[in-house]
């Protein structure tokens, strides 16, 4: 009898506590992680219908997570249209992970961006089915840019991106957010025969970044984008944390497809496995670094330069 009463009391207590957790997602509760801070972007106004501009709603969810000690920003399956560019924290992007502010301290917060699914095919688009179009990847959680942007010809300028980590106010401009990206696809808008003007993901100022099952691609056919030699503007699929931030980084199952001028841009301390670049002029680019990187399987196809 006592055991039954105690179990019932515990269940009631947990239910009360977790009911008060702001914007708890149903998937989190169903999986047993009922007291984890999970913020569903639909609860902040995102539609995921491919029509509404979801930029403001998703940004609100990201800001809320940072302001409340971190947690998971959850994207249910759908196509999230991004039609507004933002400039803040010395970066330009549709979505910005703002820095954690702790005056006089150097502490960190973890934020996870997690989709429901991310469909990645083993080749460019779906050539094995006789099709060659970006829509074959729509059956997943896709954040797509509806802004063409402007050509960027200055390599020293800050790139315009779909997602970026904003700069912090400490010595190395470190964001102090540990960022995890899982089961998400990011699509940049492009013109036929040209690389996208926007870059994909810019984590140059992230404290640390971890990924699993992430796809970054453009809106046009891959066969029209096999390293166009006269397309001289700069864009990159994935930009890792910069020199002197001394972060620990882990990329797993990240695919840059069809196509950017640079597939991946790395500095030091990068750990990577199952990284794939398609149709980029430079597949894997290593910038200034004082320490080493470690990689397992990396793959490049239809790229002019594999290592730069």
PLM-predicted stretches and their roles:
Residues 155-168, 181:
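Surface-exposed, low-hydrophobicity beta-strand/loop segments enriched in small/polar/acidic residues
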Residues 45, 55, 59-135, 140-149, ...:
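N-terminal extracellular ligand-recognition/capping segment immediately after the signal peptide
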Residues 1-6:
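Bacterial N-terminal signal peptides that target proteins for export
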Residues 75, 82, 97, 115, ...:
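Extracellular beta-strand solenoids
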Residues 7-16:
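Bacterial N-terminal signal peptides
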Residues 137, 168-279:
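Right-handed parallel beta-helix
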Residues 38, 70-72, 77-79, 88, ...:
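Detector for repetitive beta-architecture
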Residues 21-60, 79:
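Right-handed parallel beta-helix/beta-solenoid
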């Amino acid at each position: 009898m006592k055991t039954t009463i105690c179990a019932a009391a515990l269940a009631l207590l947990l239910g009360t506590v977790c009911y008060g957790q702001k914007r708890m997602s149903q998937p989190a509760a169903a999986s047993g992680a009922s007291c984890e801070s999970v913020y569903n972007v639909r609860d902040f106004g995102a539609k995921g219908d491919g029509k509404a501009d979801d930029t403001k709603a998703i940004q609100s969810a990201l800001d809320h997570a940072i302001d409340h000690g971190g947690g998971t920003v959850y994207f249910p399956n759908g196509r999230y249209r991004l039609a507004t560019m933002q400039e803040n924290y010395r970066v330009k992007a549709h979505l910005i992970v703002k820095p954690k502010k702790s005056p006089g301290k150097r502490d960190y917060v973890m934020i996870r961006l997690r989709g429901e699914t991310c469909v990645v095919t083993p080749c460019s688009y779906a050539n094995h089915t006789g099709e060659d179009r970006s829509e074959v990847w729509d059956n997943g959680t896709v954040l797509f840019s509806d802004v063409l942007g402007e050509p960027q010809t200055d390599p020293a300028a800050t790139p315009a991106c779909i997602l970026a980590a904003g700069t912090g106010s400490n010595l190395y401009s470190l964001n102090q957010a540990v960022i995890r990206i899982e089961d998400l696809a990011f699509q940049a808008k492009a013109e036929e025969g040209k690389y996208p003007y926007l870059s994909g993901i810019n984590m140059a100022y992230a404290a640390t970044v971890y990924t699993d099952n992430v796809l970054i691609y453009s809106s046009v056919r891959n066969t029209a984008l096999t390293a166009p030699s006269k397309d001289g503007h700069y864009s990159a699929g994935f930009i890792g944390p910069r020199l002197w931030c001394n972060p620990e980084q882990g990329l797993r199952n990240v695919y840059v497809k069809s196509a950017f001028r640079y597939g991946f841009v790395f500095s030091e301390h990068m750990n990577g496995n199952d990284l794939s670049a398609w149709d980029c002029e430079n597949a894997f680019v290593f910038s200034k670094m004082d320490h080493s990187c470690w990689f397992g399987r990396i793959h490049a196809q239809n790229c002019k330069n594999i290592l730069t």
